[in-house]
Design a protein with these regions (language model features):
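C-terminal and inter-domain tail/linker signature
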Residues: 1-136
């Protein structure tokens, strides 16, 4: 699935938008970089997406938030976060948006990446424990 075009996103986002993603994904500034650095890899590396809906939605002033546990299931078809193809996994996601005028200007996205990686067979906490506390 190809990412949306800059024109499509420009209907809802300011050109100088900022997207703050979790550590392995990073942050992006401007619509073209958002497409290149996040939306493109996310759509090309993950297939079979199933949205489970939002469990909570709330807003106040210029801010809105939603989350779901899980909110999205997908299949790692290879390349996402540098990983080879893997199985289906759930993503636990929190999205917080800020609006400036009639368009979105910022988006903070929290994804429980360690949980997603564990479902792909990589337990980063166990691996870190093994590195820091090697068996004698």
């Amino acid at each position: 699935m190809e990412p949306p075009s800059a024109e499509e996103l420009g209907r809802f986002w300011h050109e100088d938008m900022i997207w703050y993603g979790p550590a392995p994904i990073g942050a992006t500034y401007t619509i073209p970089r958002y497409i290149k650095q996040h939306t493109g890899p996310f759509r090309r590396g993950l297939g079979g997406k199933t949205f489970h809906g939002h469990k909570v939605r709330f807003a106040e002033g210029n801010f809105a938030c939603f989350f779901g546990w899980p909110n999205l299931s997908n299949r790692n078809i290879g390349g996402f976060l540098g990983l080879p193809a893997g199985g289906t996994a759930d993503m636990q996601v929190v999205d917080v948006y800020c609006r400036r005028g009639d368009k979105l200007s910022e988006n903070w996205v929290l994804i429980d990446i360690p949980w997603w990686l564990k479902q792909q067979g990589l337990d980063v906490f166990q691996r870190t424990s093994e590195i820091l506390n090697p068996a004698e």
